[in-house]
Amino acid sequence: MGRKQQYGTLASIAAKLGISRTTVSNAYNRPEQLSAELRQRILDTAEDMGYLGPDPVARSLRTRRAGAIGVLLTEDLTYAFEDMASVDFLAGVAQAAGDTQLTLIPASPASSVDHVSAQQLVNNAAVDGVVIYSVAKGDPHIDAIRARGLPAVIADQPAREEGMPFIAPNNRKAIAPAAQALIDAGHRKIGILSIRLDRANNDGEVTRERLENAQYQVQRDRVRGAMEVFIEAGIDPGTVPIMECWINNRQHNFEVAKELLETHPDLTAVLCTVDALAFGVLEYLKSVGKSAPADLSLTGFDGTHMALARDLTTVIQPNKLKGFKAGETLLKMIDKEYVEPEVELETSFHPGSTVAPI
């Protein structure tokens, strides 16, 4: 039987080169403290001796840090990489993280998730802190993060959790220009499409009670902001149909658009709380030989690259900046630096070309 292969260690590399273990360690962890020549000599010797570098598990036990931050989102990973607003947000977090590893923590949004399973998910995440991205009020994962004592920053929702900095635009105010564009174009028969309002599943019509008690306040505030503009224009809020898409993906967005427009064929305009829903409307219109704005005026919210390329009438929010601010704030918290308790992001209105006079 052959002898088991022996790999180099910090001590054996140090002994061979006649230097200290600390100097060898610095070649990996603090290279700026060594000359380029010495560092290269250490790395070459380590390679010859089969040393693979510092053990991250041993390092985390020694420093009590994982060297990673997490992003908790109540969506599956497919959504995280297909929804353009989320892609931009995660790119911003990654930019802020720099050399710090980024871990995605996908959690179920369902109301059936209990505190035990939420705590288990959070406890299994090897992270030093968490960015909470667009999670419902009362979600058990938030309590689990608090119970573990992890620093946390909230982006979008839920608002104003004690000890957790909050970063978001004023959604109620931000959507007003999109709603006003429809009013100014003469539209009075307007429908609203929203993504998930509550942890309890619902696809289809939204009751006033569900809207008022919504656990996802971003969508609630956008709907409310639009309704305020409509009411100011003399529209009876009871005549404005609101439909919800609980799973935000292409198929479901198409289906909810189809349901809204087939059950309310008199609508001349649709306001969407996210660009993705507006694309569902565009896809449905195309399937029946229609288009926007020729047959229906349409607005979105997010200002994703795809929306701007289509020249959708929409509200632009700085999703990448939001992610960067969230990541930057979390890293400061981990290092016990001062952070602002709340950051309100600016939005802008893109008039686009999907709203036309009635």
From Swiss-Prot:
InterPro entries: HTH_LacI, Lambda_DNA-bd_dom_sf, Peripla_BP/Lac1_sug-bd_dom, Peripla_BP_I. The lineage of its organism: Bacteria, Bacillati, Actinomycetota, Actinomycetes, Mycobacteriales. It comes from the Bacteria. This is HTH-type transcriptional regulator IpsA. It comes from Corynebacterium glutamicum (strain ATCC 13032 / DSM 20300 / JCM 1318 / BCRC 11384 / CCUG 27702 / LMG 3730 / NBRC 12168 / NCIMB 10025 / NRRL B-2784 / 534). CDD domains: HTH_LacI, PBP1_LacI-like. Keywords: Activator, Cell wall biogenesis/degradation, DNA-binding, Repressor, Transcription, Transcription regulation. Residues 8-63 form the HTH lacI-type domain. Residues 10-29 bind DNA.
